Design a protein with these regions (language model features):
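Second-shell loop/turn segments in exported
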Residues: 146-150, 158-164, 199-208
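A cross-family detector of function-defining hotspots
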Residues: 169, 178-211, 217-258, 269, ...
Length: 282
């Protein structure tokens, strides 16, 4: 349930054709009460927690001509640990910005460096909002960008060969073929697996890329759940007889951050899913 100091925002969506309605809600946390936002040069609101490099945007929601502080982090965050793992892919509790600069409210600017950006009026508080800057996101623009999501379905030596291929497409394709052992399977694997990865980037981008998050990883391996149950403090994804619980763990960088409750019981089915994916059986 909600605590006394929490509020929720509710949206009701009605499809008149089929005469059905859905209710969606989000918990508004006082410690993350930020009214600022990004807007494109064309005046469109940026609803996603990411933008692409060299895309002109402006910060709004502050006082006119008020300067705000932007902290830039170029950390490479780890991919999620498997659902059966006892150890988490932990991130340092305190990450240090690579650089800090200021922008005025409404000032149009383009971010040229990929990474994580945190917007704050006062760096001594725990208020602000963050977004990622990527290239060609949520798609995978370069061959080397494709390597990361393989970490969930590859042995270490296979992953190393993919990484060493650089942007050499011929070597990359050869490494993928060594995993799937069939040209048609390789083609289907790339199409379906990276379609899932793109969706994960779009839906689950946090302080790190969507495919690296716990929910993104689960989506990559299991696909879309048959049902999602949302509670104030957690989400439960149902796949028939298998359920995954994600505990809400809000941070300054991502108020909507969720952490998978891991358990050894998932190991056997997880390996079965990975084996099916490697054989392009989705």
């Amino acid at each position: 349930g909600l605590s006394t100091n929490q509020q929720i925002i509710v949206a009701k969506v009605i499809n008149n054709t089929i005469k059905r309605g859905w209710m969606f809600y989000a918990v508004l946390l006082p410690e993350h009460s930020v009214n600022s936002y990004l807007q494109t040069a064309e005046g469109d609101f940026v609803f996603d927690p990411y933008i692409n490099v060299n895309k002109p945007v402006a910060l709004h929601g502050f006082k006119e001509n008020e300067s705000v502080i932007i902290s830039y982090y170029n950390d490479v965050f780890p991919a999620a640990a498997p659902a059966f793992s006892e150890g988490l892919a932990r991130v340092s509790a305190a990450i240090k910005p690579d650089s800090i600069f200021t922008l005025a409210n409404g000032q149009l600017t383009s971010f040229t460096k990929k990474g994580l950006y945190l917007v704050q009026k006062d760096t001594t508080t725990v208020e602000g909002f963050a977004f990622r800057v990527e290239d060609g996101y949520p798609k995978f623009k370069h061959i080397q960008d494709l390597v990361g999501p393989f970490v969930y379905v590859c042995a270490k030596d296979e992953y190393d060969r993919l990484r060493m291929a650089g942007n050499d497409k011929k070597q990359f394709d050869k490494s993928v073929l060594a995993i799937t052992r069939d040209t048609d399977r390789a083609r289907e694997f790339m199409k379906t697996y990276f379609s899932r990865a793109e969706v994960a980037n779009h839906l689950f981008t946090s302080y790190k890329e969507g495919w690296k998050t716990d929910r993104g990883m689960t989506y990559l391996i299991y696909g879309a759940p048959t049902a999602v149950y949302k509670f104030a403090d957690r989400e439960v994804w149902s796949y028939g007889k298998t359920d995954f619980s994600f505990s809400k763990s809000s941070t300054l960088f991502d108020p909507d951050n969720y952490v998978l409750i891991r358990n050894k019981k998932y190991a056997a089915e997880w390996y079965e899913k990975v084996d099916l994916i490697r054989n392009s059986r989705f």
